[in-house]
Amino acid sequence: MSENRRVVVTGIGAITPLGNSVSDTWENMKNGKNGIGSITLFDTEKFKAKLGAEVRGFDPKEYLEVNEVLRTDRYAQFAVAAAQQAVDDSGVEGNVEPERFAVIFGSGIGGISTFETEHTKLIEKGPRRVSPLFVPMMIGNMAAGTIAIRHDCRGSVMPAVT
């Protein structure tokens, strides 16, 4: 690091089990909601756990073109949507040096739904049926990279996988 600089958060966005925007999430938190409900994203018949905190009512096509939706894992779709909300919320307009914009994005694991889908294809149909986009869609840094490309951020781009 050549010099110390301040970091300024100019906007926020949120895709959560409590809502698909900051305002919806905040209102539901204030009203004591927890976002927990019956799991719908997979069959829970063989599991003891039947409850989870899923994001509901999210339409990735509100933020991505159809071809982008097809080649982007759900976790990255959430990230792109929240980042777009944050950019919109920021009110930043005009000529801003792309080198001064950074993306630091945290996730728990990356594209686990892509991993599951492609693993099933591998087992049931063989390696030739696995998507060539398998690795790019599931890696933990795909969300940060996609956000950076969409918003021409040329500063640091760092995934924080916990």
Go through the PLM ranges and name each one.
Residues 1-157:
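Conserved "HGTGT" condensation-loop signature of ketosynthase/thiolase-family condensing enzymes
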Residues 159-162:
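Short beta->alpha junction loops
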